Swiss-Prot record:
It comes from Malacoplasma penetrans (strain HF-2) (Mycoplasma penetrans). Located at the top of the head of the 30S subunit, it contacts several helices of the 16S rRNA. In the 70S ribosome it contacts the 23S rRNA (bridge B1a) and protein L5 of the 50S subunit (bridge B1b), connecting the 2 subunits; these bridges are implicated in subunit movement. Contacts the tRNAs in the A and P-sites. Pfam families: Ribosomal_S13 (PF00416). This is Small ribosomal subunit protein uS13. Residues 103-124 are annotated as: Disordered. Keywords: Ribonucleoprotein, Ribosomal protein, RNA-binding, rRNA-binding, tRNA-binding. PROSITE patterns: RIBOSOMAL_S13_1, RIBOSOMAL_S13_2. Residues 103-117 have a biased composition (Basic residues).
Amino acid sequence: MARILGVDIPNNKRVVISLTYIFGIGKSRSQEILSKAKIDENKKVSALSEEELATIRKIASEYVIEGDLRREVAMNIKRLMEIGSYRGIRHRRNLPVRGQRTKCNARTRKGPRKTVANKKIETK
């Protein structure tokens, strides 16, 4: 496996697909990196030379990816929570942020149901 920016990318796949294993690089950015490096997208990672891998590393290091990007996203969410915006409050309460309904569904964000004891009213 080739190692680019601290991430092992698979040898048996095409370069354009393998680069998407790096957090922050999708298909379009992968194509952009390969066009700048003048490398064929259909080439397998195992067929790349060390010079080609070095150029990919150099070009990819210009972008905000992996740990820096994760940190930036976390800081953006933290900032929203600190300023008390609507989105920040939704993050703090672990509710859907983008306007989804919560009366039913939203189980992924809310987590498993919290059952309330003694809710049934006994009839006499």
